[in-house]
Amino acid sequence: MVNMFKHIKKSSNNSESWNKKEWQIAEELAVKYLKEKGYKILEKNFKTPYGEIDIIANKKDIIIFVEVKSGKGIRIQPSERVDDKKYLKIVKSAEFYLEFYLKNKNYKISQIDVIEIINGNIKHYENVGWDFT
């Protein structure tokens, strides 16, 4: 298997918790950031039988599935909470979206990104592993 997270370590459970309002603010920051970088937002909080994708965007015929992670980053970075189990849910959800919503569309490639937000600071990890081509 390809190293899925070139910049992200695997982690165990984390006791940090953010309330719903803080989580929504983090996603809004991620959407704003992506729009400023030229991405078109296709979906937010897209639910599938396999899980939820925080943001689905596209840029230059590339479909990007974005997982947003936020927190204080005291003991563990928020992006480190994207472990193999979470990654597999994102992959299955992305496959579902591509199969049922973009079946007849012509997109070149798709990728999974992780956006980490700590105290309003954004780190964007692009193409963290799985390639749909």
Swiss-Prot record:
Q: Name one Pfam family in it.
A: UPF0102
Disulfide-bonded cysteine pairs: these are none
One example of the protein's molecular function in GO is: nucleic acid binding
The cross-references to PANTHER family, in alphabetical order and at most eight, read: UPF0102 PROTEIN YRAN
Q: Which family does it belong to?
A: Belongs to the UPF0102 family.
Output this protein's name: UPF0102 protein Fnod_1509
Species whose genome carries this gene: Fervidobacterium nodosum (strain ATCC 35602 / DSM 5306 / Rt17-B1)
